[in-house]
Regions:
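Basic, alpha-helical nucleic-acid-binding regions used in initiation and control of genome expression
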Residues: 164
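Hydrophobic alpha-helical transmembrane segments in multi-pass integral membrane proteins
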Residues: 300-304, 365-380
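Alpha-helical transmembrane segments
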Residues: 334-338, 402-411
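Extracellular/periplasmic helix-loop-helix junctions in multi-pass membrane proteins
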Residues: 376-393
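Intrinsic disorder/low-complexity segments
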Residues: 414-426
Length: 426
């Protein structure tokens, strides 16, 4: 507006200085000018006033940005404001620091002037883009995607629509335009950046819960498969009947899926870095855990199976009582391992916030009561016979090391390694 006004050079310089000072404080400025005229004029106006408007950031934004940084999420600010205003806002939210290099900021026209190769090499280091146009935002998204990044874009205006549409996840604001909402995948009703952080936490927690269920189910299947194969190799009848396997794989696994999927989200997942899109859901660590735990369950059960086959002649084979002990022991091993599955991928104890995981406790109770009901009343259908309370106590006791060994391993992993004096370090 000042370019349309008639004023002295000194006055114009004074106004420019004031504007820079306000922009450095992240103020947005609005100028008023007038002139007597019968039609619109763009020259000879008289400057009336300049207003500096403060649009303070929300108090929860800096903490949310810091959470993103800890989670390995790189936050970039793209705005139509001037460079000075954009950098000050970035400083307030925590994406710009005193040691941030100048090349981490660029204007939209300068970004458009870069060649594709130059922009590609620089785009990951950018933190602030000012005076950005719709094409600049879209180009930024496309270049980040070429680097293999998963890109989420927030916006509320019509000019944000191209970037929202091309991003992996487009997030429009509830107060935004209908064009932005139609181009986005998710609408933030509360217009809060913190909601994005919560969505990431929920998504990562759900992914972790799926890993936990797969770990639990595959341990059951590995151990059961090995036992069936071992029984065939030894020449004995199947140690687990079809109905027993149905109870283990169908009912128990369904309950376990409900319990593990309902575990509440944990802020702990925000301390880990993002996974690659090509990563297999079962990490090498989980795969080894499935194999090792499955074998550790298989070994004592195999020893029990061999011991039950110790007799020869007319009494050869496992009687119903021994089959019941075998079946119940196997189920209780999985019952204890459900707590290990809860703590999978965490350094916390399996008992951490256990009382708040009511669905898990309910499922464990249902499995325990269901197993008791099958053993007590299953009869010929499940090929079982009732067990005494003493036998139940012994089975629960001898199978509990599955949990205690897991607890010790988590404790050792959580404990910091003792530091060596400087002279003893390699």
């Amino acid at each position: 507006v000042t370019t349309f006004c008639t004023m002295t050079t000194d006055a114009r310089a004074d106004i420019a200085q004031r504007l820079r000072a306000w922009q450095d404080k992240a103020y947005r400025t609005l100028a008023f000018a007038c002139a007597p005229c019968e039609e619109i004029r763009t020259t000879g106006l008289t400057l009336q006033a300049i207003v500096a408007i403060s649009d303070p950031i929300r108090t929860d934004v800096p903490a949310a940005v810091d959470q993103c940084r800890q989670a390995g999420i790189n936050v970039k600010m793209v705005t139509g404001d001037t460079s000075a205003t954009a950098i000050e806002i970035a400083r307030q939210i925590g994406t710009w620091g005193p040691n941030t290099p100048a090349e981490a900021q660029i204007t939209g026209p300068d970004f458009a002037a870069l060649s594709d190769e130059e922009a590609y090499n620089r785009v990951q280091r950018l933190r602030v883009m000012s005076r950005a146009r719709p094409t600049d935002k879209q180009r930024l998204v496309n270049l980040l995607q070429r680097h293999g990044e998963v890109v989420a874009v927030t916006g509320d205006g019509t000019n944000d629509a191209p970037a929202l549409n091309h991003a992996h996840v487009g997030l429009s604001l509830g107060s935004g335009t209908s064009v932005a909402k139609n181009a986005s995948d998710i609408t933030l009703i509360d217009d809060s950046f913190n909601s994005i952080v919560k969505a990431v936490m929920w998504g990562r927690s759900l992914y972790k819960n799926i890993q936990r269920f797969l770990y639990f189910q595959l341990v059951v299947n590995v151990a059961a498969l090995l036992l069936v194969l071992a029984g065939a190799a030894i020449g004995t009848e199947l140690p687990l009947t079809v109905t027993q396997i149905l109870w283990i794989n169908l009912i128990m696994d369904t309950f376990a899926a409900m319990a593990l999927a309902s575990l509440p989200p944990s802020a702990e997942v925000m301390k880990s870095k993002p996974r690659r899109q090509t990563d297999f859901i079962l990490t090498h660590r989980i795969q080894w855990a499935i194999i090792v735990v499955g074998l550790l369950m298989f070994a004592p059960m195999l020893a029990f199976l061999v011991w039950c086959e110790r007799e020869t002649g007319a009494n050869a084979g496992m009687d119903v009582h021994e089959l019941t002990l075998f079946f119940t022991t196997f189920v209780m091993l999985q019952w204890w391992n459900l707590l290990n599955a809860k703590a999978l991928g965490s350094d916390h104890s399996a008992f951490h916030q256990l009382l708040s995981d009511r669905t898990l406790l309910l499922v464990m109770l249902l499995v325990l009561v269901g197993q008791w009901g099958i053993v007590t009343f299953g009869g010929e259908m499940f090929r079982v016979t009732p067990l005494s309370f003493k036998e139940w106590g012994v089975i629960i006791l001898v199978t509990s090391p599955v949990l205690w060994i897991g607890e010790m391993l988590r404790l050792l992993r959580k404990s910091p390694s003792p530091s060596l004096p400087r002279g003893e370090r390699g």
